[in-house]
Amino acid sequence: MKITVIGAGNVGATAALKIAEKQFANEVVLIDVVEGIPQGKALDMYESGAVSLFDTRVIGSNDYKDSADSDIILITAGLARKPGMTREDLLMKNAAIIKEVTSQVMKYSTNPIIVMVSNPVDIMTYVAHRVSGLPKERVIGMGGVLDTARYKNFIAETLNISMQDISALVLGGHGDAMVPVVNYTNVAGIPLTELLPLDIIDGLVERTRNGGIEIVNYLKSGSAYYAPAASTVEMIEAIARDRKRILPCTTLLDGQYGINSVFCGVPVKLGKNGIEQVLEINLSAPERSALQRSADIVEKNCKMLESLFA
């Protein structure tokens, strides 16, 4: 299996190393526009294989031709969010970048699965889908996996328990309108509402919504990358190993949850064909309304990009 990572920044490079270490790909190609950066990072990763005990070939390049015949393409290219900047502020600049990147990779790979990480991820997934012409099942956004990871982390920290015992879902857009679904949150099967009062849960939900900007405010000149990379690799491994994992991912909805033709984060089954099933779970009226509001924001922002495709 060949996996290409576009963007050799913090998220892309960290994801590339994790993929190499897990050895579910024969070859990882790291591509970036800056000469020397992907080559140097790829060589450094490859040399770590003697210590970390992996044989995955890691190659760095500035040429999209080296992505030829990729099975999975991970797109992390784009501008990082800065303090005071919302994901939506990145919209026009990153949309133009993603349009160009997608056009280039599709010249050399006929039927890849594209995993989008660049923000605003729901809208960039839309751009990649529109430009690539791939079936909706093969263009997937990473948002819900990361948001769910943060939600689990905050719950575990509050209860002083293992994160491994927490089951949770965060739906909707990867932004301020995300929807942590409290009714589907449990600890070893015990509903979260039996372990924490509602005001504490509301605080955890709010912290989850602001999880990304919390890290941006600490870093000042960058954004999160360890957790985004780990979340992305969890998705890619599920696809590469055909694990049929149920994960919250950004996908194009076709009537599910009453939402049509909008990319939104919902539970899906991930396997060798990409998104193999969209799971429609029962939501409370407030949760369904919140999911619709989240989808409306994504749809509104996507309409702002029409000039990009003129």
Curated annotation (Swiss-Prot):
Catalytic activity: (S)-malate + NAD(+) = oxaloacetate + NADH + H(+)
Binding site for substrate: 81, 87, 119, 150
Keyword flag Ion transport: no
Enzyme class: oxidoreductase
Listed EC numbers: 1.1.1.37
Pfam families tied to this protein: Ldh_1_C, Ldh_1_N
InterPro entries the record matches: L-lactate/malate_DH, Lactate/malate_DH_C, Lactate/malate_DH_N, Lactate_DH/Glyco_Ohase_4_C, Malate_DH_type3, NAD(P)-bd_dom_sf
Binding site for NAD(+): 7-12, 32, 94, 117-119
The keyword Electron transport is assigned to this record: no
Keyword entries, A-Z: NAD, Oxidoreductase, Tricarboxylic acid cycle
GO biological process, alphabetically ordered: lactate metabolic process; tricarboxylic acid cycle
Gene Ontology terms for molecular function: L-lactate dehydrogenase activity; L-malate dehydrogenase (NAD+) activity
Residues at the active site: 174 (proton acceptor)
Known role: Catalyzes the reversible oxidation of malate to oxaloacetate.
Family membership: Belongs to the LDH/MDH superfamily. MDH type 3 family.
Protein's name according to its UniProt entry: Malate dehydrogenase
